[in-house]
UniProtKB/Swiss-Prot annotation:
Keywords of this entry: Cell cycle, Cell division, Cytoplasm, Septation
Biased composition (Acidic residues): 45-56
Species classification: Bacteria, Bacillati, Actinomycetota, Actinomycetes, Micromonosporales
Protein name: Cell division protein SepF
Stretches the record annotates as Disordered: 20-116
Keyword Cell cycle: yes
Organism: Salinispora arenicola (strain CNS-205)
Gene: sepF
Basic and acidic residues composition bias: residue spans: 22-44, 62-95
Length: 226
């Protein structure tokens, strides 16, 4: 064996078996086969145990990974099954729930507007007994100017029926006074009635003038009744 060949063997660049086979090739052709057989037998007898462990470890790790994946898949399947089983129960519970509210209306939430007040039922005024209706006095006024409208308003405000005789007024002032009397009766919830062409009767809300008295007024009996 040459020095360079030995150095290569020492450095691991050249295998020693190849060197031996090369040296024996010239003497015996069967030596190469024997050395080959010996090397294979040597590898079988004195093979590296680490190589076998590495080769066997690969399938084990793969089997371990496969088993872990199978367990994870089984767990996820159980979770999905549990979720699917819970969903119908949740839906059923949600469908059974009901909201109960108090049917009693709250008076604090009632807001009055102009439309509501117009449509709201008005309180019915109590009927005055017949004997009380007779307890009134009719005041007769003969205004000559529009300035006497204040006197008419004061009597009517005190609950006294007023007969307005406009025969002594001119046409323009008479119309103005009639308009005033109509507004006064409407504002105080009373009534205004035409007795003759220029005679009007103002009745307060709590006084009901009888038909007999109205007939006397129409005949010209402008007097006070007690």
């Amino acid at each position: 064996m040459g020095a360079l060949r030995k150095a290569g063997v020492w450095l691991g660049l050249v295998e020693e078996d190849d060197e031996r086979a090369y040296d024996d090739a010239g003497y015996d052709k069967g030596g190469y086969r024997e050395s080959r057989y010996r090397s294979s037998r040597y590898s079988e007898d004195f093979g590296d145990e680490d190589d076998e462990d590495e080769e066997a470890a690969v399938p084990r790790s793969r089997r371990g990974d496969r088993s872990r994946l199978e367990r994870a898949a089984a767990r996820s399947g159980d979770v999905d099954h549990n979720v699917e089983g819970e969903q119908p129960e949740r839906v059923e519970r949600a469908s059974v729930r009901s909201i109960t509210r108090s049917a009693e209306p709250s008076e604090s939430l009632t807001y009055h507007t102009r439309d509501n007040l117009a449509l709201a039922p008005q309180p019915v005024r109590e009927r005055v007994p017949a004997d009380e209706e007779q307890r009134y006095q009719i005041t007769t006024l003969h205004p000559t100017t529009y300035r006497e409208a204040r006197t008419i308003g004061e009597h009517f405000r005190d609950g006294v029926p007023v007969i307005i005789n406009l025969t002594e007024m001119d046409e323009a002032d008479a119309r103005r006074l009639v308009d005033f009397a109509a507004g006064l009766a409407f504002g105080l919830r009373g009534t205004i009635e035409r007795v003759t062409n220029r005679v009007f009767l103002l009745s307060p809300a709590n006084v009901q003038v009888t038909a007999e008295d109205k007939a006397k007024i129409a005949e010209g009996g402008f007097f006070s009744l007690s």
